[in-house]
Swiss-Prot record:
Protein name, per record: sn-1 oleoyl-lipid 12-desaturase
Upper classification of the organism: Bacteria, Bacillati, Cyanobacteriota, Cyanophyceae, Oscillatoriophycideae
Keywords: Fatty acid biosynthesis, Fatty acid metabolism, Iron, Lipid biosynthesis, Lipid metabolism, Membrane, Oxidoreductase, Transmembrane, Transmembrane helix
Broad class of where this protein is predominantly found: membrane
Underlying gene: desA
Cofactor: Fe(2+)
Segments forming a coiled coil: none
Length: 347
């Protein structure tokens, strides 16, 4: 994949730092990157609210031939809501958890996303990044698992690992985040609250929208912007950890420090996307510590590049990049890293 800057491998990192711990990397970061600034946090809320309101006003008056780009733009602004809730889920939006929970639930509500289930599952992803036994975000099938799967599962997996990658987060959201029985104890109560909050709000809002706007109005003002959001949700999360050079590891060989530093891709997007999505693409520092607020990610990444730059993966968003990922990174073989479906069929 020519668009990825390939650094020395994780093996090289371990050879040079055989006793490397995540704490050793974190100790090189300035303490200021962890500082929570209420003014900056709420300024990002205001930016997203203004952007979403502006896009919906534009959507209301846009002629039919401009609907597609306006839907896409509106979905991008809604992704800003997700990133605000993302900070809340990592407790880096506010020092007060009740504020994080309140803002997180409200930010996720237009996306019909239960906050606590996402928070818990996403933190599990952070704890076990690129661990084949534990990671719940874009962990690839092995050839053996794929071969043993029912035909329907194979078809869905081929679709979301191919040209329909942008729908993967829809499946992830609906499959994992409404089932509170998959959680235990206090977490089950929290997830049930978040799921019911979304379900009850939807049970009120959707009939009102259908009654006042009609079917086309719901498609125009909710479904298409929501799919625009999921385009970015799927794209960001796929690119964060998926290039042929980045390995997944099984539990017995997994190293936390290597997974967080060299298992995450830094990808540059068009500036307007980065602004509206609050720098969610600056993902390496966020994986080293979830306590870094989104507005401090660039400062943190500058420090990481200075101290650990030779072990980072960097790329720039392009359709060539997405084509390469969706045509190559299908199944995971511990010996060869990713192989494509076509390569697997020839074996």
């Amino acid at each position: 994949m020519t668009s990825v800057t390939v650094r020395p491998s994780a093996t090289t990192l371990l050879e040079k730092h055989p006793n490397l711990r995540l704490r050793d990397i974190l100790d090189t970061l300035p303490r200021s990157v962890y500082e929570i600034n209420p003014l900056k946090a709420w300024s990002r809320v205001l930016l997203s609210v203004a952007a979403v309101v502006g896009c919906y006003a534009l959507l209301a008056i846009a002629p039919w031939y401009l609907l597609l780009p306006v839907w896409f733009l509106t979905g991008t602004t809604l992704t800003g809501f997700f990133v605000i809730g993302h900070d809340c889920g990592h407790r880096s939006f506010s020092r007060k958890n009740w504020v994080n929970n309140l803002v997180g639930h409200l930010a996720f509500l237009p996306l019909i996303y239960p906050f606590h289930s996402w928070r818990i599952l996403h933190n599990h992803h952070h704890r076990y990044t690129n661990n084949m036994d534990e990671d719940n975000a874009w962990a690839p099938f092995t050839p053996e698992l794929y071969d043993d799967s029912p035909a329907f599962i194979k078809a869905v997996y081929r679709a979301i690992r191919g040209k329909l990658w942008w729908l993967a987060s829809v499946i992830h959201q609906l499959k994992l985040h409404f089932n509170w029985f998959a959680f235990e104890g206090k977490q089950r109560e929290q997830v049930r609250f978040s799921a019911l909050f979304v379900i009850i709000a939807g049970a009120i809002a959707f009939p009102v929208m259908f009654y006042t706007l009609g079917v086309w109005g719901v498609v125009k003002f909710w479904l298409m912007p929501w799919l625009g959001y999921h385009f970015w949700m799927s794209t960001f999360t796929l690119v964060h950890h998926t290039v042929p050079e980045i390995p997944f590891s099984y539990r017995d060989k997994w190293n936390e420090a290597i997974a967080q530093l060299s298992g995450t891709v830094h990808c540059d997007y068009p500036k307007w996307v980065e602004v509206l999505c609050h720098d969610i693409n600056v993902h390496v520092p966020h994986h080293l510590s979830t306590g870094i607020p989104s507005y401090n990610l660039r400062k943190a990444y500058a420090s990481i590049k200075q101290n650990w730059g030779e072990y980072l993966y960097e790329t720039k968003f392009s359709w060539e990049l997405m084509k390469a990922i969706t045509e190559q990174c299908h199944l995971y073989d511990a010996e060869h890293n990713y192989i494509s479906f076509a390569q697997h069929q020839k074996r």
